[in-house]
Design a protein with these regions (language model features):
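Single conserved hydrophobic/aromatic residue that forms the stacking wall/gate
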Residues: 249-258
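Conserved beta-strand/loop scaffold segments within soluble protein domains that form the structured core
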Residues: 109, 113-121, 125-250
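Generic hydrophobic alpha-helical segments
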Residues: 42, 224, 255-256
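Basic side chains
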Residues: 28, 49, 184, 200, ...
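Short glycine-rich, polar/acidic loop-and-turn segments at beta strand-coil junctions
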Residues: 39, 52-54, 93-96, 103, ...
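N-terminal amphipathic, basic helical "cap/leader" segment at the start of enzyme domains
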Residues: 1-142
Length: 258
């Protein structure tokens, strides 16, 4: 079975295993249809004319880890921001690790996107922001949307300054010979709010891992967001990253110099 067919075949069971709102279900099904029609990009696509995915797609990727993997904190502590207290959302082989994470709802939201997609109190934010600036015509973005489950949801309310930086960390352990990951992040920084975010992709040993990541960032008027991405993987790892940003830019009348 080709990898595309494996993805399509596994989606029905995956969709039935989660409890999201009807609108999210519909978005996911529409995105799956887009991926089914377009398939994986090839060199015929302008953005991929210098890159072929053919050899990578021959791997028999695991889509869902069979068991949850645990990691001793002493083995990965060096990958956290040194001597700085931070909020953390940590994933191990695509699965959320509550032991390594430090989330919050105290004045701001740093939590899982699965919680935001499934709980009614977040419905207004999801309807306003989820999948609104991601490229819905892109096949890999659509694939990510159709399988959205794990990832971070961050909301910094109006005029709030996050007291601590936020770390989003994805560890791949090598427990699976070949692994396909699809994290989805939704970040909203409201008017006059401030936050620093660091996203890290870290493989712990050489193995075939592909991360098809999608992040949507909304930075409202007079907000400040410092966002850093670190990919510290072995050469056997691949990161496909689609980050979309919506922000406010004002150009006021000025005197021309020339």
């Amino acid at each position: 079975m080709e990898f595309k067919e494996k993805l399509l075949a596994s989606h029905l069971a995956f969709e039935g295993s989660i409890d999201f709102s009807d609108s999210v279900h519909q978005t996911r099904l529409e995105s799956l249809k887009t991926f089914e029609q377009k398939g994986f990009p090839s060199r015929k696509d302008e953005a991929w004319k210098y890159t072929s995915l053919n050899s990578m797609l021959r791997n028999d990727f695991a889509l869902f880890p069979e068991t949850e993997t645990t990691i001793e904190i002493k083995k990965v502590k060096k990958y956290f921001l040194y001597e700085i207290d931070t909020y953390k959302v940590v994933f191990i082989d695509g699965v959320y690790s509550p032991f390594l994470s430090d989330t919050t709802h105290d004045g701001l939201d740093v939590c899982l996107i699965s919680a935001a997609l499934s709980k009614s109190k977040y419905r207004r934010f999801i309807d306003t922001y989820f999948n609104k600036i991601a490229d819905t015509k892109d096949s890999l973005t659509s694939l990510n949307t159709s399988f959205t489950k794990e990832g971070a949801y961050i909301y910094i309310p109006k005029s709030v300054v996050a007291e601590k930086p936020i770390e989003l960390i994805h560890f791949s352990t090598g427990k699976e010979k070949s692994l396909w990951l699809q994290p989805r992040n939704l970040i909203v920084v409201d008017k006059n709010a401030q936050v620093q975010i660091l996203e890290r992709h870290q493989s712990l040993k050489p193995h075939q891992v592909v991360t098809n990541s999608v992040t949507e960032i909304f930075a409202h008027q007079d907000s400040f967001l410092d966002y850093y991405k670190i990919q510290n993987d072995f050469s056997t790892a691949s990161l496909i990253d689609n980050t979309s940003v919506s922000y406010t830019h004002l150009t006021l009348p000025t005197k021309r110099i020339v």
